[in-house]
A protein has these predicted regions:
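Acidic/aromatic-lined carbohydrate-recognition and catalytic surfaces
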Residues: 2-210
Length: 210
């Protein structure tokens, strides 16, 4: 057995340890500037660190921040990067540290779907998407297709009822060929848009199912 007697949970020299954290739920109604305005009060309470809810760009209207759309941006409805920097400056002014939750393993399927650019690319290009490695996809299970369980029955029934519609009015540009299903938007693999609808749905990098 390894000798663990030398191990310790104490921090190394110069490391700051949170002693008392205060969690702040960031959203459009309580942004980074709102949090900054409370820095002095929280410091007076004896708080040592502000603990922020997820700070990355979530779906519009999110109140919790775990429904991430863009891992490269700070929550814009809460003030964006500039307001975030003001919060950090205010915290430092009052001797507070800042702990951020970045939830790198969280994403969401928004409406419209194209707001999540990595997911949109994955659905359009499948295994060839530059974002394919971002996702835990078992490509062998669905014959290189991504399962999207959004239907109330079979895809054949949905097509026959007219629940799945092809239109050139979606995607980031608003002019891409997409499949619509009751408000859910799915990209169409380039070059398949002229196929008959029953063939087109089977030619995509995803499989719509119940």
């Amino acid at each position: 057995m390894a000798d663990v007697t030398h191990l310790t949970h104490r921090p190394g020299p110069g490391r700051v340890v949170p002693v008392s954290t205060y969690r702040l739920q960031i959203h459009a109604g309580f942004g980074y500037d709102d949090a900054a305005a409370r820095a002095a009060y929280l410091a007076d309470l004896g708080v040592t660190h502000l603990y922020l809810s997820p700070v990355l760009q979530p779906a519009p209207g999110s109140t919790h921040g775990y429904d991430v759309l863009d891992h490269t941006r700070i929550h814009e409805e809460a003030g964006g990067r500039e307001a975030f920097d003001r919060l950090v400056a205010a915290a430092r002014k009052h001797g507070l540290g800042v702990i951020v939750d970045v939830v790198p393993n969280h994403m969401t399927v928004p409406r419209p779907t194209h707001l999540n650019a990595p997911l949109w690319s994955l659905l359009r290009e499948g295994r060839e998407s530059p974002y394919a490695a971002w996702f835990d996809v078992d490509w062998d299970v669905e014959d290189d297709r991504i399962l999207m369980p959004v239907l109330g029955g079979t895809i054949g029934e949905a097509v026959e009822r007219g629940d799945v519609v092809l239109a050139q009015d979606g995607g980031p540009s608003g002019r891409e060929w997409v499949l619509w299903h009751h408000g859910d938007e799915f990209p169409v693999r380039p070059g398949t848009e002229t196929l008959p609808l029953p063939e087109l749905v089977e030619a995509q990098a995803y499989r719509l199912s119940s």
